[in-house]
Amino acid sequence: MSSPTSPTSSPGRHHWSNSKDGMPPEYTNQDPNSDQADNENSDAKAHQPQHSPQHSTENQGHTGTSDTSSLEMELSKLHPESKQRQLPHSPEHERSRSPIASVVSYRSHMTLEDENQIFNAEMAVRGSQSLQRRPTGRSVRGSMRRLSSHRSKSMRTSKSKKSGDYERTAENEEAAQEAENHLDNFGVVTFGTEAPIKAPDHPVTIFGRIFKFIQQRSFYLRSLIYIIPLGVLLLIPVFIGRFYHPQPPYRDELGHEYERHLHVGGVDLMWMAIWWEIIWLSIWAARYAAKVIPYFFAFFVSFISNNVTKWRCMAVALEFPITLFLWMLAVYVSFLPIMTRRHIGDYGVPDHVRVKLPWQQSANNVLITLFITSIMNLVEKVLMQLIAMSLHRREYESRILYNKFAINELARLYGYARQRSFDFKDAIHRAQADVFKFADHQHGKKRAAAARVAQNALNKTTYKAISAFNFATDMVNKVAGEITNREVEKSSSPKSVVLHLLKTTRGCQSLARCLFEALVNPENPDLVLDDFIPVYTDETGEVDNATLEACYSIFDRDLNGDITCEEIELACVEIGKERKSISASLRDLNDSISKLDGICMFIVAVITLFIFLYLIARNFSGVLTSAGTTLLGLSWLFSGSAQELLSSIIFVFVKHPYDVGDRVDVMINGTVTSAMVKEISIMSTEFRLLTGKVIQAPNSLLNTLWILNMRRSDGIADPVTVNLKFGTTLQQIEQLRIKIIDFLKEEKRDYKPDLLTEVTDLPDLYSMSLCVVFFHKYNFQDEVLRMRRRNMFMCALMTYMQELDIVSPIFNSPGKSKDSPMYVNFNNGSMEGVKLSGGNDGGGTENHRDSTVGGGILKNPKAYPYREPTPPGSSDSDTASVSKKRVDFSLGTRHLMPAFDDVADIGSKRLGRDSLPDAVIENAGTEAMRREAEERRRAEEEEYERSQQESSSNEENENASRTSGARFSFSSKASRLSARPSARTVPPLQHISIQDLREPNENNTSKSARL
């Protein structure tokens, strides 16, 4: 909702000076710019929404009104009067203001909807979402928005779907948390190549419920639940083989007795069962080892790398491949020693002969194949992680660093604003407590008193449990942060509120207006750098200038020195969109890498098959020849698909010309198509056209096209070509340039103060094509802003051309103007009474021919922009002297030549970590990045100190040379020759100073005489 603007204010600027008696506008939901605002002011005051969980109805009676009034009183007592600039208390203002609006700053740009958005975010981060999902637990903001009847009906009729909505909301929260982890752990991309086994959302059978219950437990408890039952079952054959002997002992020829053992495939049953037990326990031992390996790996990597977190996260992502490798290693190593050393003879007696039975040889070949497969799988996963990390570092590291820094600074500013203007902590607790006083109404019917009391008690218990859980979570995070030396955000921290507000465009605008309201000076309509100093001043009074300037540059993109409320809104919206774009890009990148991983796994499976055939086949060469012949014969079938796949892989992972959310211009068949990147996959890309249509294009085709990425572009030049009348004077063109440049300087927030004009063509001496090139300060990523800026320029251009009487070439046609009359030739003779404009002597025709055809534009007095028309009676010499004055035929482009030198842009790199300020890296970077920034700053400081010392020593030497030079002088001949280099050695006591060389010869002579 826009704020009222004064008639003298520029468009898009927030002013409140048009209100009566210099007072700010009243807080209503009406648009201040609408014509009906004054007429409906009284109705808006009468229907002002209150802070209550439901609208007042006749069924609620006097209780709801009293509770709402008490809630308003509680909300109005949040801050002392010394910390706020409240509006004057009057009955009219009291009726028009909400309880939260009463504590808003004096020059408020915030509306009631903005306050609702912030209050909504504060409620959400404090764990009240579970109460909001319940019909009786609606928050205070529900009534403030006056829900429509359709929404109220849908909420009443959806009670049977609450459980399903809860599950979907939980899934969305998990997805949001995963995206948050992707943004936090930059430098590492974890892709889900091994999806965990998930239980159904709504299990029907008892076994499904049990499995879901087990899957929801922690890993260690879940592993014990799985290990113990099956491990105990596998111990049964071990005890049977050890203690149970159904047959009598065997006696050999010498009379020795041997116990007969049960055997399976010639191997003792006990040892066979032990090997089965090893198979089961080794998989969990490998899983536990994979959990511990990242910490040991990080310890050893810390000796050679500073970025330990990245490699530890990589080892965590490789948990499943490492588990598979260790498991197959244990199974393969334990198979042959157990099977060959525990052989049972023909009579069931161990013969202690190491014999490899045929089935054991075949099983060993299978285990070898699986072990090699696990090795190839681990190597393939490591390569995929390295590719993902390299692509992530190249494309997203700088964007994530800058976005995290911007969010951290927004959180700092919001924390300052919350302490300064409106702290909702007490209001939220009271509001949540008052919410429980209202009973739920189902289809307009009241529940029984006992049910209402029970429901209120349940809600209170739930609220207390949530508060206790949040408190316990904050305490655990605090202890964990002290142990790990890391700062952990609280559940109700300003950053959590900022992240919640950045999810929607409306929340971004509310956050921006809140920050502007808290920082702006009452005497200045805009923000300046000094307004941010209280936020970045520590307890000792020192100001963090580096972080302050970096934060100020987030909002002051045009570098004009001040920040308007609109600029903060655009910056916050851009930060929110950038965060969503990065999350979507990382998600699509993970999907693409997962598909590439699937392709590589198919290749690994083919290699595994050939290895297995090599181990079991007697004639492997024949099998390989047959397979090669078949593959060659079917090459025509999948050759095109293989080529398309290779082109797509190169396009996505090597070229990577765009990311999700980028606006691109693709040239297809000579036609430029503008679209927004919606989704990127390994084989195709989905675009959303500006018309709303969604199209899909294969990456193999896009690999051969020209693609213009608007987001990666800087300020863009926008040419406009206009056709003017032939004979348009240079004075008119110069005046047009001056007016347009003044317009660009006035609108310096959107345009650069540079203008290029070029006469491109003079077709048939009938018209003149003038190309006007102006420069935007931003790119064309936002189509709405591009249209707005171009419309402003086009309207200004049209207005100035109309003021200067610059017309279309159609006015050169006969009869269109007085300068180009239309002559009519009658075959029957001339018309009587018609007199030519040149007179009877025909001199007028000759003069007209001389002034237009013979003289041309250079002899036309109007063509000279810097001279007055030649007065009558002046001599030809005066006219010739005036005609010798220079005319700027470059149309103002001469002074712009050095400014548009494109040589410096050739070979320049994109925005990387080196181009980011140190404050951004220290605030949002990893520990390794912070150390690099500190080392770089330390090196710069040492270099600066060294240069200062050298400069001071040079000054001392120069002063010494001047002092010694005053005692010695040379003759005029020597002074003239002293400027040339000499091969002779200078005496040690003679010093030549520049001051001596610049003195006149007579001074040198007098000095030498005195010496």
UniProtKB/Swiss-Prot annotation:
Keywords: Calcium, Calcium channel, Calcium transport, Endoplasmic reticulum, Ion channel, Ion transport, Membrane, Phosphoprotein, Stress response, Transmembrane, Transmembrane helix, Transport. Residues 27-36, 49-71, 873-882, 963-975, 1002-1011 have a biased composition (Polar residues). The keyword Endoplasmic reticulum applies. SUPFAM superfamilies: Sm-like ribonucleoproteins (SSF50182). Its main location: endoplasmic reticulum. Residues 1-223, 309-319, 388-595, 655-1011 are cytoplasmic. Changing E566A: Viability decreases in a calcium-dependent manner. The modification Phosphoserine is found at S98. Regulates intracellular calcium levels and cell volume for survival in response to hypo-osmotic shock. Acts as a mechanosensitive calcium channel in response to membrane stretch. The conductance is about 0.25 nanosiemens. Involved in maintaining vacuole integrity and protecting the nuclear envelope upon hypo-osmotic shock. This is Mechanosensitive ion channel protein Msy1. It comes from Schizosaccharomyces pombe (strain 972 / ATCC 24843) (Fission yeast).
